[in-house]
Swiss-Prot record:
Gene it is expressed from: proS
Function recorded in the entry: Catalyzes the attachment of proline to tRNA(Pro) in a two-step reaction: proline is first activated by ATP to form Pro-AMP and then transferred to the acceptor end of tRNA(Pro). As ProRS can inadvertently accommodate and process non-cognate amino acids such as alanine and cysteine, to avoid such errors it has two additional distinct editing activities against alanine. One activity is designated as 'pretransfer' editing and involves the tRNA(Pro)-independent hydrolysis of activated Ala-AMP.
Protein name: Proline--tRNA ligase
Cellular component per GO, a single term: cytosol
Lineage, opening ranks: Bacteria, Bacillati, Actinomycetota, Actinomycetes, Bifidobacteriales
Subunit details: Homodimer.
Origin species: Bifidobacterium adolescentis (strain ATCC 15703 / DSM 20083 / NCTC 11814 / E194a)
Entry note about domains: Consists of three domains: the N-terminal catalytic domain, the editing domain and the C-terminal anticodon-binding domain.
Disulfide bonds: none
Biological process, per Gene Ontology: prolyl-tRNA aminoacylation
Similarity comment text for this entry: Belongs to the class-II aminoacyl-tRNA synthetase family. ProS type 1 subfamily.
């Protein structure tokens, strides 16, 4: 270590917000160049390379072949798939000196597709799976959590190309199995969850989430063991309610009752329920106006904005992230007061379904409705049962409906998953109530289907001489994020505690004291260990106290620590212990290398 490019820190960096970020910087694995941008130091590169090599071994086991693309890509392929617009502000765009547009690659679907199109033209060429391990770039609005959410990150992305859907499913399952082996070898706990495809497109996707509280993703698990990202969670269709005995809908004044709480208070004070119970927030249908920002498409030369109204039970909170996933590739935000002013039918605090959607288009449009175009789309949350009666807005100031029945008095243009899921909600598979955890996405697999093949013209001749599009799959692992997640789950109060398979070395040898014999014994031990193929870090610093050396060894996180010091000189022994301080023993110098080799072998099993 006297010549190693290394300076450990005693204090956490002021801007580090998660344990992995604090420890990786303190132990000199990384240094921050700018928010979300990192300089990799020798220890960090060592660990990163070992993770990458495990990935390469498992990719080779399924006959995937490695390639490498540029990180600087032309605009045109991304325009052909509409992702130049769909990514919005999330990508880095630039122009060259000739004013041609480029981007820093967020992913490489288009380039892989064009490469295969350029080289392959027959069914005899398929199937093939290609992959790369490369730096990607995304213009994160707020980089956080160190390597977990950065503006640049290292990713393994693989793409399978097959003649038909059956081939795609096989390639998908091969990659999925390889991912499980990779994460198992890395000793990283993971949960495969059903997921939304998002801007990637396709029709089947799973995420691999590492469960941890700092995760940005929430996933739900059913008693049967199945799991879903909450964005992909579907609500079991509620049983329809018989409304034959429900009174006709009635408009009633509800002055100064523009919020859920005030509606409940007013109704309980002025309109007691016939069943004797109090009005509750769950009796109210609240109607939320959102603005949907659609990207440019075949029908629109420019990105365009649409107002949509979503009806949800009054006791539930709208989950904007979950709702947005169903409008992909569009983005959504809450509508502004300026948006509402353009639509007189949207009376703030009293918005209801009768001036919206199918009922407005069927000639029942409220007298004060906008004349600027078709009625706004009206969507209903999946928790709303047909036949259910609601206390909701009447599209007039200080007026609400009572007993407005979904399916009798109003319809919707569609059903959406709009609200936050919560403990006690039923699982989609019907096995019981859901439970929830947070996690960090470490990998995702997609069955892309024909999206990119059709957009970019990737076709081959099949066995009958017919030109057919190629079926594609996409498979990603966040390599640098995986490293952070391992650090996040493998540490204690003293520092990092790497799994032996990716630690920067298997053994950290510390020489202490001023007696040259201790340093000579340490050097002899290191020579014997290296002859056995064991990687070693040697702390040979002469002017550093034993206490500092031990603290650095525990901070750096190599799994086995061997100490040559006073006991070596006096008793002819080397102290060998695990990184966590357990299983300490004094081993004769002559036997130390073999004793350590046995420990290493046990750790690498």
């Amino acid at each position: 270590m006297s010549t190693m490019f290394l300076r450990t820190l005693r204090e956490d960096p002021a801007d580090a917000d998660v344990v992995s970020d604090k420890l990786l910087q303190r132990a000199c694995y990384l240094r921050k160049a700018a928010p979300g941008i990192w300089t990799w130091l020798p220890l960090g590169l060592n660990v990163l390379n070992k993770i990458e090599n495990i990935i390469r071994e498992e990719m080779a086991s399924i006959d995937a072949q490695e390639v490498h693309f540029s990180g600087l890509l032309p605009r045109e392929p991304y325009e052909a798939t509409h992702r130049w617009e769909e990514y919005g502000d999330n990508i880095f765009r630039l122009k060259d000196r000739h004013e041609a547009d480029y981007l820093l690659a967020p992913t490489h679907e288009e380039m892989f597709t064009l490469l295969v199109k350029d080289l392959y033209s027959s069914y005899k060429d398929l199937p093939v799976t290609l992959y790369q391990i490369q730096t990607k770039y995304r213009d994160e609005f707020r980089p956080r959590a160190g390597l977990i959410r950065g503006r640049e990150f290292i990713m393994k992305d693989a793409y399978s190309f097959t003649l038909d859907k059956e081939g795609l499913v096989k390639a998908y399952m091969d990659e999925r199995g390889a991912y499980e082996r990779i994460f198992n070898r890395l000793d990283l706990k993971y949960v495969p969850v059903h997921a939304m495809a998002g801007p990637m497109g396709g029709f089947e996707s799973e995420e691999f989430l590492a469960p941890m509280e700092i995760g940005e993703d929430t996933f739900a698990q059913s008693p049967s063991g199945k799991a879903w990202n909450v964005e992909a969670l579907t609500t079991p269709e509620p049983e329809a309610i018989d409304f034959t005995a429900t009174p006709a809908a009635e408009k009633r004044p509800t002055p100064d009752a523009a919020t859920i709480d005030k509606m409940v208070e007013f109704a309980n004070a002025n309109h007691p329920r016939s069943d004797g119970r109090d009005w509750q927030a769950s009796d109210i249908l609240k109607n939320v106006v959102i603005a949907v920002m659609h990207p440019q498409d075949e029908d629109h030369d420019e990105p365009w904005r649409e107002l949509v109204v979503v009806g949800v039970p009054g006791d539930r909170t709208v989950d904007m992230k979950r709702l947005e996933a169903q409008f992909t590739p569009a983005e959504i935000e809450e509508a502004t007061d300026e948006d509402l002013k353009k639509h007189p039918e949207l009376v703030k605090g009293y918005i209801g379904p009768m001036a919206l959607g199918p009922q407005a288009r069927d000639g029942k449009k409220a007298e004060n409705a906008s004349e600027t175009g078709d009625a706004l789309r009206y969507l209903i949350d999946a928790h709303v049962a047909r036949g259910s009666a609601w206390f909701t807005g009447a599209d007039e100031q200080d007026v609400d409906y009572y007993d407005l029945v979904y399916g009798r008095d109003f319809e919707a243009d569609g059903t959406v998953e709009a609200v936050q899921v919560r403990h006690g909600d039923m699982s989609p598979d019907g096995s019981g109530p859901l439970s929830f955890e947070r996690g960090v996405e470490i990998g995702q697999v997609f069955q892309l289907g024909l999206k990119y093949s059709n957009a970019l013209g990737l076709k081959v001749l099949d066995q009958n001489g017919k030109t057919v599009p190629v079926w594609m799959g996409s498979y990603g692992i966040g390599v640098s994020r995986v490293m952070a997640c391992i650090a996040e789950t493998h540490h204690d109060e003293k520092g990092l505690a790497w799994p032996a398979v990716i630690a920067p070395a298997q053994v950290h040898v510390v020489a202490t004291g001023k007696d040259a014999a201790a340093f000579e014994a340490a050097e002899q031990l290191i020579g014997e260990l290296e002859a056995k193929g064991i990687e070693v870090i040697f702390d040979d610093r002469k002017k550093v106290s034993p206490g500092v050396k031990f603290k650095d060894a525990e901070l750096i996180g190599v799994p086995i620590i061997a100490v040559a010091g006073r006991d070596t000189v006096n008793n002819g022994t080397i102290e060998v212990r695990d990184r966590n301080g357990e299983n300490a023993e004094a081993v004769p110098v002559a036997d130390a290398a073999q004793a350590i080799a046995d420990r290493v072998a046990a750790l690498l099993k």
